[in-house]
């Protein structure tokens, strides 16, 4: 089975793979975060259960296509991250997707509980998960990219400034109650 899809390019740095197109609204947050830092990504829908051979081939060929890490999002019996990690030496970051009868707890545990030797870094359920997956990938890339590291430093500073403004606002409202 050939690993071919529109918009695949050797120039992409991060692979984003989701088990279903219904995951895209959540996973797009990872893509948007990467794009905001100027990191290019390829995006695919590949099912660990319905297209296992394609998942394995995708992972086996990822490094040769220039990818530096893979972000894998799946819900339910979320084996996508594990299948990809079993077939590559690239870092794999798993995003468990909430849904179904267990509201994502099954996906969280399936992504998190990998056997020794097949690591999948796992992020949170919900909207923080894809953002943190992208930021984790960016942090890995920034180890050898000073410009990207500077963007991360600016991002962290902006987060701190946002908290300081929120603190000042709440304190002003609290003072008015006294």
Model-derived segments and spans:
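Glycine/charged-rich beta-loop-alpha catalytic/anionic-binding loops adjacent to active sites
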Residues: 12, 39-42, 89-90, 113-123
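C-terminal binding/interaction regions
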Residues: 18-25, 29, 105-178
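Acidic, glycine/proline-rich low-complexity segments that act as flexible tails and inter-domain linkers
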Residues: 25, 41-43, 53, 76, ...
């Amino acid at each position: 089975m050939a690993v071919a899809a529109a918009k695949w390019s050797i120039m992409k740095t991060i692979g984003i793979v989701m088990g279903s197109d219904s995951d895209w609204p959540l996973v797009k947050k990872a893509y948007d975060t990467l794009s905001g830092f100027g990191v290019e990504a390829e995006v695919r829908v590949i099912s660990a259960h319905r297209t296992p051979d394609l998942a394995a081939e995708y992972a086996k060929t990822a490094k040769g296509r220039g990818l530096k890490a893979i972000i894998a999002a799946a819900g339910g019996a979320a084996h996508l991250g594990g299948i990809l990690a079993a077939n590559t030496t690239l870092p794999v970051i798993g995003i468990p997707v909430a849904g179904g009868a267990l509201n994502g707890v099954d996906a969280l545990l399936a992504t998190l509980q990998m056997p020794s030797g097949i690591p999948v870094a796992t992020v949170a359920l919900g909207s923080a998960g894809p953002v943190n997956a992208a930021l984790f990938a960016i942090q890995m890339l920034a180890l050898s990219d000073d410009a990207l590291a500077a963007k991360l430093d600016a991002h962290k500073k902006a987060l701190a400034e946002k908290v300081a403004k929120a603190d000042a606002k709440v304190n002003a409202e609290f003072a008015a109650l006294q």
